[in-house]
Amino acid sequence: MFDLDRWQEIFQTISWIEETTGTVNEWSFERFKVNHDISVDPHGYRLQHSSGANLVHSGDTGPCEELYQAIKRSNIAIVEMGVPEWVEIDGHHKPSHIESLSQRVPDTKLLLTHTYLDMKDSEFEVLTSKDYPVFNDNVIHAYDGICLKWNGQNWKA
């Protein structure tokens, strides 16, 4: 059974770190605003390990220059593509946004999450889309169980 009082008690013990930059162990981070509903306090993060490994994670967001500048300086970016092209919304990426970004940062891998697409070649029935956008080679559609490994120079999926 869900115990709301217990969760509220736990929530009060959390120390929120809201600095825009910092270091934790061997990881440095940058925190920056992204383009999404302001009520959820949307931020992206760029992480850099002392080994040279680095990545960006955006969470829910639509196109925004601050995110794209962080991606430009990174080996891989985990970005969402939450809506198909025909949806009129500003706070999520569409296929055309991803295509444009992939051309802008050809040396950065873009790992798509939170997509409206069913996984291509899935063993399950396709429910949401049978039409898959064609992207440049630096775009990867993430899937459950995907594993990213740093090989000392780049990320391998």
PLM feature spans:
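Binuclear metal-dependent hydrolase catalytic cores
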Residues: 1-56, 62-64, 108-109, 118-157
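Charged helix-capping and loop-helix junction motifs
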Residues: 90-100, 125-128
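Histidine-centered active-site/metal-ligand motif
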Residues: 36, 92-93, 114
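Active-site-proximal loop/helix segments of hydrolase catalytic cores
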Residues: 40, 53-90
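Hydrophobic beta-strand segments of well-ordered beta-sheets in folded domains
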Residues: 75-77, 107-112
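Flexible loop residues that form catalytic
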Residues: 82, 115, 144
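Short, conserved loop/helix-junction motifs that constitute active-site signature segments
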Residues: 70-73, 99-107, 134-135
